Amino acid sequence: MKPKTTYIAAAVGIGIIVLAIFYMYSADQAKNRGKIFGDNLQTIQDELKQIQVEFYSKKTMLEERTMTQEEFAEFSKIHIEKMKQILAKYDALLPPESFAKSVELFKLSTQKQLESDQYLMQWIATNDTSDKIRSDSLFQESFEDEMAALESYNKAKNSAGQN
């Protein structure tokens, strides 16, 4: 082999090695970004669950008369702010494209849950049955959106795992 051909072959070999390293690095980075996204989404969902458990616990306390309506109204203001903070956290997520739909559905579910809670608070304050009916309806829609979000998330996760 001529020296020039040897240099070209060596350069091509080095180029292939560099591309392989870059590909592996990119794949690792994508996997890391996916894990970070999944962890952040799980944290948001856990916070949301805790906020809702606390809200319904306070509602039970009100029903059992261990909390006054005024105390519940004050707590409700804090609850609404916490729910708005959760919604903002969805906006801050940077989901991989395949997970964008599930994040939209999780956020929509949370928005409907917030609306449901607000109608429930209104019903408690006014005893207007239409507020309770609207709250229940939004609660059901929120649940359905949550199930759709979970299904979408699992489909995207399974597709990503097969690649």
Give the location of each predicted region.
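Transmembrane signal-anchor/signal-peptide helices with a preference for the extracytoplasmic
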Residues: V18-D39
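Hydrophobic membrane-insertion alpha-helices, especially the h-region
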Residues: Y7-Y23
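Intrinsically disordered, low-complexity segments enriched in small/polar residues
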Residues: T5, I21-Y23, E97, E104
